[in-house]
From Swiss-Prot:
Pfam families, alphabetized: Prenyltransf
Species assigned in the record: Tropheryma whipplei (strain Twist) (Whipple's bacillus)
A molecular-function term among this protein's GO annotations: ditrans,polycis-undecaprenyl-diphosphate synthase [(2E,6E)-farnesyl-diphosphate specific] activity
Residues reported in the UniProt entry to bind Mg(2+): 30, 217
Protein name from the UniProt record: Isoprenyl transferase 1
A cellular-component GO term for this protein: plasma membrane
InterPro entries xrefs: UPP_synth-like, UPP_synth-like_CS, UPP_synth-like_sf
Family: Belongs to the UPP synthase family.
UniProt record, GO biological process: polyprenol biosynthetic process
The record's free-text note on cofactor binding: Binds 2 magnesium ions per subunit.
Highest taxon above the source species: Bacteria
Function: Catalyzes the condensation of isopentenyl diphosphate (IPP) with allylic pyrophosphates generating different type of terpenoids.
Quaternary structure, from the entry: Homodimer.
Length: 249
């Protein structure tokens, strides 16, 4: 894995042995709305402020050497929010992707997209696909943008795919195991989640990477997402490195 030389604003990452780092970190970026409410601002201002946190955490992940990072950007349940907020979120996400992809490319980040295209619109889907294409040869880190993503739907889609192959005679029902199911997930080349991290003090998983997080270490941090920075991310990595993982044993 290549670590690119970038201006890291003078921040030195903690020394964490590579063997003690999580390979795959999944992050629920929660608290934008509450951040705005605390300041008597419209909710969309919280989402705008969250962009800086996202960029800083991605920078910190590359800097310290985390190879896989998944960010929960927009869930399938987010469609239930107020229509004006949903429209803003989709438009803002499109703009952030277009605005930041050259920076990610410069950092050596490969951007991937997990989710379904339904209802996203052709322009946003094109931005996602273009970004995947532009960054596909990058090797510093794999960034999984989870947009219009829901873990239960991902599992349902995987099961449907397996059932179709069984009915077509391509595989036998007896051969179906965990590895086959994992290979039908949206990102089959990503390892299972080692560290599941959530901001804002909420202690729940919210339908994010349920299959992949079966044996993940869970860390819930109180800071709201717009205030979250790479130092907070590194603090979570240090906490993870001090844990003894059991993998269900």
């Amino acid at each position: 894995m290549e670590i690119f030389s970038v201006d890291w604003t003078g921040q030195t990452p903690p020394h964490i042995p590579r063997k003690s780092l999580p390979r795959h970190v999944a992050v629920v970026m929660d608290g934008n709305g509450r951040w705005a409410n605390q300041r008597n601002l419209p909710r969309i201002e919280g989402h705008k402020a969250g962009e800086s946190a996202l960029i800083d955490v991605v920078a910190g992940a590359v800097q310290v050497g985390v190879p896989y990072l998944s960010l929960y950007v927009f869930s399938t349940e987010n469609w239930l929010r107020a229509p004006d907020e949903v429209r803003f979120l989709l438009r803002f996400t499109r703009d952030v992707i277009a605005r930041r992809r050259e920076l990610f490319a410069h950092w050596g980040v490969r951007v991937r997209w997990s989710g379904v295209p339904n209802r996203l619109g052709k322009v946003l889907v094109k931005e996602l696909r273009d970004t995947e294409e532009i960054t596909k040869k990058n090797t510093a880190m794999n960034l999984n943008v989870c947009l219009n993503y829901g873990s239960r739907q991902e599992i349902v889609n995987a099961i449907k795919s397996i059932v179709s192959d069984v009915n077509s005679g391509l595989i036998s029902a007896k051969s179906v195991n965990e590895k086959i199911i994992s290979r039908r997930m949206y990102m089959p080349d990503f390892p299972d989640v080692d560290l599941f991290l959530r901001s804002s003090g909420e202690n729940r998983m919210s339908n994010f990477m349920l299959w992949q997080s079966a044996y993940a270490e869970l860390i819930f941090m109180s800071k709201l997402w717009p205030d979250f920075r790479r130092d907070d991310f590194w603090a979570a990595l240090r906490a993870y490195s001090g844990r003894s993982r059991r993998f269900g044993r």
